[in-house]
Regions:
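Bacterial N-terminal signal peptides that target proteins for export
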Residues: 1-12
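C-terminal segment of classical bacterial N-terminal signal peptides
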Residues: 15-24
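N-terminal non-cleavable signal-anchor helices
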Residues: 12-15, 304
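Short, aromatic- and cysteine-enriched interfacial helices/patches
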Residues: 2, 24-25
Length: 313
């Protein structure tokens, strides 16, 4: 892959040289977002002042993504790269090195209070490169699943854009404030939806443990056969243990995720007798014509699927 990336970069070097330093931001700010959720935040903050490229596209899995030569070219041309951090993007450092980008890299989880991943899969996830605190505790990188954290991402994006393009700062701040108001309203909707579900029914199953921040923020319990990363499947013993826990906790619904193979969830559904309730969007947005093409639509879809499967509506 490195040879093809370097070849693609060589083709773009003349363009980069021609751009030079003159009128650095007379043209839109060149922004690279690591995956679609961050890309959506960037669009809402940047508007028409940015030229956005998103690395991991709709329904893509950033845990296992392999970057392309085109990704390296985009990185090399970028003014700003927006990333999640907390080891969410396993491909990131390789892509930075291969592209030799000089872009500013904004880590959007700056200011977020990280939570630790559930201990069942901590050892396996640590072996796969997830961030640890020195022991087997693993930091959950899916901070965007809390709307309160999404607001932090948005603020960090606005700050990064203001630093790179001072002339557009008022616009970025106004856009961020307007979008944050929409997130405030969204959070109220999610809280109301969860409150309508009886406490004893607030247990659901998903493919991998991507919803820890949602669980902590809104009081819904998620059980998952896979850990914080999708890089490896759980063992038969892990699945058997989860099936036992599902029966013990009387889980009310089970869901596939848009980024994972549904086979394992279908197996668990068969063994527990719980009907698959639909698809939740975890680490990526849907295609533009899908039900979760924006972050707000993602949250609307997920809460509607969860509430509908549990309450039968």
């Amino acid at each position: 892959m490195l040879k093809s990336i370097r070849a693609a970069l060589a083709v773009s070097v003349i363009t980069l040289t021609a751009l030079g330093a003159s009128s650095a931001f007379a043209q839109p700010l060149k922004v690279v977002a690591s995956f679609t959720i961050i890309g959506d935040f960037a669009k809402n903050v940047g508007g028409d002042r940015i030229d956005l490229t998103t690395i991991v596209g709709p329904d893509g899995d950033a845990h296992v993504y392999e970057p392309s030569p085109a990704d390296a070219v985009a990185m090399a041309k970028a003014d700003i790269v927006l990333v999640n951090g907390l080891h969410f993007e396993g491909f990131l450092q390789r892509l930075v090195d291969a592209s030799a980008t000089k872009a500013s890299i904004a880590v959007l989880t700056k200011g977020v209070t990280p939570i630790n991943f559930k201990p069942e899969f901590a050892e396996a996830d640590a072996a796969e490169g997830a961030e640890t605190d020195g022991g087997k505790t693993v930091t959950d990188p899916h901070a965007f699943q809390s709307i309160a954290n999404a607001k932090i991402y948005v603020k960090n994006i606005a700050d990064a854009f203001c630093t790179a393009d001072a002339a557009g700062c008022d616009s970025y701040k106004a856009n961020a404030a307007a979008y944050t108001q929409k997130l405030d309203a969204l959070e109220g909707e999610v809280q109301a939806a969860i409150q309508s579900i009886p406490q004893e029914k607030r247990v659901v199953i998903t493919s991998h443990d991507a919803f820890g921040y949602f669980e902590k923020a809104y009081g819904l319990t998620f059980l998952a056969p896979e850990g914080v990363s999708t890089e490896s499947e759980p063992s038969a013993a892990d699945v058997a243990k989860l099936v036992s826990q599902i029966k013990q906790d009387k889980a009310a619904a089970i869901f596939v995720e848009n980024i994972t193979n549904p086979r394992l969830i279908e197996q668990i559904a068969s063994e527990t007798g719980i009907k698959v309730g639909g698809t939740l969007y975890s680490d990526a947005l849907s295609q533009p014509d899908g039900p979760a093409s924006t972050y707000i639509d993602l949250m609307h879809n997920n809460i509607a699927q969860i509430k509908g499967a549990i309450l039968g509506s």
